[in-house]
Amino acid sequence: MDKQKVTALTQKHRSLFRFLFRLHNRFPFVNRRKGRIRTQAGLSYLKGCRITGGAGNTLIIGDYARLKNCVFHIEGTGNTVQIGPWCYCENAEFWIEDSGCTISLGAHTALCGNIQLAAMEGTNITVGEDCLFSSAVRLRTGDSHSLLKKSTGERINPSASIAIGNHVWVGTNVTILKGVRVADGCVVGAGSLLTKAYSQPNCVLAGVPAREVKLDVDWTPERIPVREIL
């Protein structure tokens, strides 16, 4: 059944489907909860997920999102994790260590296994719509520990937010560090380390540290046959 038919059917009987999804998601043998995080799940499907953290935090999951074996660990207060509609997340970990942080995924974004998103010290991780993350990807807005200038004791490694644009494909084993910006339509090569803002849209980023290696690209999850070169 395609997305339009699913949407039409569930919206016609929204109250019933909302009750059924909510009942399923709350079964303790399906998902585990600990703490007082406010959760809004709508018409979403969760299985094998673990949600822990303190009061004053919010988890919002959009309609038709599917989450399998995900971990939400939200400490502090005033934090929000928002998963957009039609997202797919499997074996993903969402970690917030302090207060005033946000992690958000745009609609139709997919996290495909062993992925960690960690925000701290009031920073944000923002991922746009229609993005695709391969396995073993790490996004961190900070270092979790303090790096100091020896002579003064001043801390020199502040945390900084991460922003990923729309329609970005991130390959396997990629690390995205604090302060990174990635423009719309980009592709990040496997094993790359992103350390800065990349403002050029529709390019391939690759390397350690990553740099622009190809311009004027686009991508699709479909496997299109390559035309034979005569």
Task: Tell me the role of every PLM-derived stretch.
Residues 1-141, 158-161, 165-167, 174, ...:
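Domain-scale signature associated with acetyltransferase and cell-envelope carbohydrate enzymes
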Residues 151-157:
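Regulatory activation segment
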